[in-house]
Amino acid sequence: SGKDFKTGQTLVKSGFAPIIGTRCLGLSGWFSTNILGNRDGLVLDEPANFHTKEVSKLSTLETILKPDVQPDLYGHGNDEDTQYYHKVRINYYPPRNDNKEGWDNIDIFGWMGYPMQVKINFLCRDSILAAPLLLDLCLLSDLAARAGRYGTQRFLSFFLKSPMHDYTKGEEAVNNLYQQYTMLKNAIREMGGYEADEEID
């Protein structure tokens, strides 16, 4: 389980950040901005409302790239000079209505510190992306209840931001989209009476 549907830039981040991490590319900065004109955009135009969403978006990269494990690539500690710069913005723009556009500028570096950039421009319809997730969540929640599973359902984090986990059991948040997909497939197999056939790396 988690908070808020993962349909736009957080989906992009949870899918692209693992590429950076598995190739051991360094990250200097990631700048994300959105424009949208629906009610969501209007609500998030208020700074106090935006703050919660900003925190969930910012935490995605940290849990995937793990700066404490690879400080030379992703920074470490509280020293801003050694950390990658991460900025997220959402702008209300009424002419777009339900059409959402997200821009991501990603500054990376490779072998011998050579700088490179990745640009992603994601034009989408918020409700078209969210509606199937709602249906999947209803069906899978019902399946979990029928299978006698209660409490936090970590496998549903595939659809959601800010994945929930049990600190008391030593669990860590999983934001990596591919690991979340493995968790989803394994949970469905287990609820169907089969063994999980994939490990989460």
Describe the function of each predicted region:
Residues 109-201:
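C-terminal active-site/capping subdomain that shapes the small-molecule cofactor and substrate pocket
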Residues 2, 6-80:
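Conserved anion/nucleotide-ligand pocket segment
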